[in-house]
Design a protein with these regions (language model features):
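Amphipathic, well-ordered alpha-helical segments in soluble domains
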Residues: 3, 37, 41, 92-96, ...
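Divalent metal-coordination and catalytic microenvironments
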Residues: 24, 40, 117, 151, ...
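Generic alpha-helical transmembrane segments
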Residues: 89-95, 152-163
Length: 242
């Protein structure tokens, strides 16, 4: 539906359809998928490498997050921005608690750490959404612009994209499960890009920062993409078929 909405917006030049397609693709599709993967897999990964780690993966928590995420989506689609806090305050509480429960208390390797650093963007996202909605409700002023969305899209989605693709690429190419330099560079650079993009929403010369952030995306991901592209076109490092 989101893709169809975007295509329709291009054909009809209706910018409202772009808004709907982004919301459907973000909170309606990507967020439920990403948060479900985090809920099921990240504690499992931690349990395999961190001594004494206790898994915490209640389905009731996941169901509650899905329900409030759909409420958030519905309110956004209805343009009820001043009421988003009804979904986002609970989501902030749920994701903050989960981040605390999931976080390994012992030493963890880099390839695991980047997963949890990425997860930390979720409560920050809903803190920004909650603040934005409550300020709008109280004063009628819409502040922060798209900062909450960029915390979600670049901070959370972008971080976990690099972390998970690196993990799968290393493992399925017969390489050790470590964060290579290109992945570290991409990951750290994305954190900087996220902060700059959020900050650009409250600066006076926003278009300058848009350009800086766009270049930042390319600089961050190009070495990483080149490396994994080379791996995909090469035989497995351990000599096994595949």
């Amino acid at each position: 539906l989101g893709i169809l909405g975007f295509l329709a917006s291009v054909l009809t030049e209706n910018v409202v359809l772009v808004f709907y397609s982004i919301k459907l693709g973000g909170m309606g599709l990507l967020f439920p998928i990403y948060i479900t993967v985090a809920h099921r897999m990240f504690p499992f990964f931690a349990g395999n490498v961190v001594p004494g780690y206790k898994l915490w993966r209640p389905l009731s928590w996941l169901a509650a997050v899905w329900a409030f995420a759909l409420l958030h989506l519905g309110l956004e689609m209805a343009n009820a921005m001043r009421w988003l806090w009804l979904a986002d305050v609970p989501l902030f509480g749920l994701t903050t608690y989960a981040t605390w429960r999931w976080w390994p208390r012992g030493r963890m390797p880099g390839l695991l750490a980047v997963l949890f650093y990425g997860v930390a963007w979720i409560p920050l996202t809903f803190a920004l959404y909650s603040a934005q909605s409550l300020i709008l409700l109280a004063s009628g002023e819409f502040v922060l612009g798209r900062a909450p969305a960029h915390a979600l899209f670049i901070g959370f989605f972008g971080s976990l994209l690099v972390a998970m693709v690196t993990r799968v690429t290393q493992g399925h190419s017969g390489r050790p499960l470590i964060m290579p330099w290109a992945a570290w560079f991409a990951y750290i650079a994305l954190q900087i890009v996220t902060v700059l993009r959020i900050a650009s929403e409250v600066t006076t010369d926003a278009y300058l920062w848009y350009a800086i952030v766009a270049i930042g995306w390319i600089v961050a991901l190009l070495p990483w993409v080149c490396r994994i592209g080379w791996i995909y076109l090469s035989p497995r490092a351990d000599g096994r078929p595949g």
